[in-house]
């Protein structure tokens, strides 16, 4: 319903006096705002500076991430400014944190270019994090409308098609990162790839910082690595892969490396998060056109995702990367050496794998999300995991995951192939126990010990790593706890 003449006159008189007017009075706060299906929604954790009203702080975030500047500008009158202003519509105190608040903000869809993560992020995180009115600010979650998601390609391959190409079903996929990640020659690198795949892994991979250094140029690595893949595939009768990292200093170099991957016949290639949103989308489009599985290493994410009060929650990165077109993304292990609270990791995996997610505050999901027709993205678990944790990994992470045992393969006392075999046997015995209806979580250690009686490599691995864990407190944990009456 259109506003009355009196209402428009009042708004003009209130908002368009020269000078500085509080953001809330400028129209960036509306407690009665009715959310539209086409709105982009964002929820920020904000810590206002001392003396700053939380509502005004939320309005300032809405303003500075949409149309506002620090003073009244008359050119607002030349636009549909009331439509284009983002609306902060809700502010809640954070449980157990007296100085923190959750601010909910709605953005008109027309504020964003279709299919452009760069444009979306330029608004949502482009300027507000340096705003003096906030002592700290963190983007916790977003809701993308279906109309907006339809402008993005989504994963280049998706979980279902990836399994069809690999002909592997009913279990997690197994991988490992070549170690040491820097310093090997091409020939030795290819030997590691062969040993790991021959021993039973589905994938080997480059690490985030192996590109084209003086000790091993990229083409040398690709050729020797692919020789290892082909020999292992021929010897095992299984489809195998190696994630060749095509990350480079320019898009031209990345496309050259990607085309060479296609030429030599690999099923998968890899990029790093640090190449940027536009480059990631570009490679996602290339991968879809060229039937290539695209793995993303989340290199650099902890610089802004790990701290609880400032930066960005990793679940937002998961959403953006599913939109951008990657097929794999590292998303936590729960039991490994890297940051990963169980509830938070569950939220990340659901974000990547579910067709729809509902509000689940315990897992950190503040909005319901319909993923429209975007394919599923395969989570990857890596960092400090070993075969003795197999029952825990399957319990926490399920089947649609790549379990990557780098040190847990290449650090095996009997060699790389034995390390791979230990992981494959541990996985298969645990999946069989689960499928038979056994209590594999509690019986897991016994199941592994029984399997080890007929598998020397598994016995050696269990003897070496025993029950090694990395029991450090997570810095990013749930703000809400599940109670007996929750979700009723």
UniProtKB/Swiss-Prot annotation:
It is found in: Plastid, Chloroplast. Binds 1 Mg(2+) ion per subunit. InterPro entries: RuBisCO, RuBisCo_large_chain_AS, RuBisCO_lsu_C, RuBisCO_lsu_C_sf, RuBisCO_lsu_fd_N, RuBisCO_lsu_N_sf, RuBisCO_lsuI. Keywords: Calvin cycle, Carbon dioxide fixation, Chloroplast, Lyase, Magnesium, Metal-binding, Monooxygenase, Oxidoreductase, Photorespiration, Photosynthesis, Plastid. The active site is at 179 (proton acceptor), 297 (proton acceptor). Its cofactor is Mg(2+). Substrate binds at residues 127, 177, 181, 298, 330, 382. One of its GO terms (molecular function) is monooxygenase activity. It is an enzyme of class 4 (lyase). It comes from the Eukaryota. GO terms for biological process: reductive pentose-phosphate cycle. One of its GO terms (cellular component) is chloroplast. Coiled coil: none annotated. It catalyses: 2 (2R)-3-phosphoglycerate + 2 H(+) = D-ribulose 1,5-bisphosphate + CO2 + H2O; D-ribulose 1,5-bisphosphate + O2 = 2-phosphoglycolate + (2R)-3-phosphoglycerate + 2 H(+). The record marks 337 as: Transition state stabilizer. Mg(2+) binds at residues 205, 207-208. The modification N6-carboxylysine is found at residue 205. Its main location: plastid. RuBisCO catalyzes two reactions: the carboxylation of D-ribulose 1,5-bisphosphate, the primary event in carbon dioxide fixation, as well as the oxidative fragmentation of the pentose substrate in the photorespiration process. Both reactions occur simultaneously and in competition at the same active site. Belongs to the RuBisCO large chain family. Type I subfamily. Heterohexadecamer of 8 large chains and 8 small chains. The basic functional RuBisCO is composed of a large chain homodimer in a 'head-to-tail' conformation. In form I RuBisCO this homodimer is arranged in a barrel-like tetramer with the small subunits forming a tetrameric 'cap' on each end of the 'barrel'. This is Ribulose bisphosphate carboxylase large chain. The lineage of its organism: Eukaryota, Cryptophyceae, Pyrenomonadales, Pyrenomonadaceae, Rhodomonas. The gene is rbcL.
């Amino acid at each position: 319903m259109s506003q009355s003449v009196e209402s428009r006159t009042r708004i003009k008189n209130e908002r368009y006096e020269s000078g500085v007017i509080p953001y809330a009075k400028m129209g960036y706060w509306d407690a009665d705002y009715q959310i539209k299906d086409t709105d982009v929604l964002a929820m920020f954790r904000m810590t206002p500076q001392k003396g700053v009203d939380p509502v005004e702080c939320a309005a300032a975030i809405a303003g500075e991430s949409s149309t506002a500047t620090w003073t009244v500008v008359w050119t607002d009158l030349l636009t549909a400014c009331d439509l284009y202003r983002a609306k902060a519509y809700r502010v809640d105190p954070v449980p157990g944190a007296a100085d923190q608040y959750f601010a909910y903000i709605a953005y008109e869809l027309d504020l964003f270019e279709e299919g452009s993560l760069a444009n979306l992020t330029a608004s949502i995180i482009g300027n507000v994090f340096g705003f003096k009115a906030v002592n700290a600010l963190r983007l916790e979650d977003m809701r993308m409308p279906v109309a907006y998601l339809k402008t993005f390609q989504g994963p280049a391959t998706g979980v279902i098609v990836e399994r069809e190409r690999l002909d592997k079903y009913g279990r997690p996929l197994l991988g490992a990162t070549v170690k040491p990640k820097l310093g090997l020659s091409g020939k030795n690198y290819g030997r590691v790839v062969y040993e790991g795949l021959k021993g039973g892994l589905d994938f080997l991979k480059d690490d985030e910082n192996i590109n084209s250094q003086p000790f091993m140029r990229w083409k040398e690595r690709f050729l020797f690595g692919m020789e290892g893949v082909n020999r292992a595939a021929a010897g095992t009768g299984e489809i195998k892969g190696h994630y060749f990292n095509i990350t480079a200093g320019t898009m031209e170099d990345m496309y050259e490396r990607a085309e060479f991957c296609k030429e030599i016949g690999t099923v998968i290639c890899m990029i790093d998060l640090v190449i940027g949103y536009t480059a990631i989308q570009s490679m996602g489009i290339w991968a879809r056109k060229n039937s290539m599985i695209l793995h993303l290493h989340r290199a650099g994410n902890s610089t802004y995702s790990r701290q609880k009060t400032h930066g960005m929650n990793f679940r937002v990165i998961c959403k953006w990367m599913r939109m951008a077109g990657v097929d794999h993304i590292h998303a936590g292990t729960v039991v490994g050496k890297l940051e990963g609270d169980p509830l938070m990791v569950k939220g990340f995996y659901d974000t990547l794998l579910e067709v729809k997610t509902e509000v689940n505050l315990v897992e950190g999901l503040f909005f319901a999300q319909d993923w429209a027709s975007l394919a599923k993205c395969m989570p990857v678990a890596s960092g400090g995991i070993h075969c003795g944790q197999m029952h825990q990994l399957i319990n926490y992470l399920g089947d649609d995951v790549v379990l990557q045992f780098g040190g847990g393969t290449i650090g095996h006392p009997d060699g790389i192939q034995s390390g791979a075999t230990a992981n494959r046997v541990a996985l298969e015995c645990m999946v069989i126990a689960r499928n038979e209806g056994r209590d594999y979580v509690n019986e897991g250690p016994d199941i592994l010990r029984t399997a080890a009686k007929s598998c020397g490599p598994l016995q050696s691995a269990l003897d070496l790593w025993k029950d090694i864990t990395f029991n450090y407190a997570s810095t990013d944990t749930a703000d809400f706890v599940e109670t007996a009456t929750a979700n009723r």
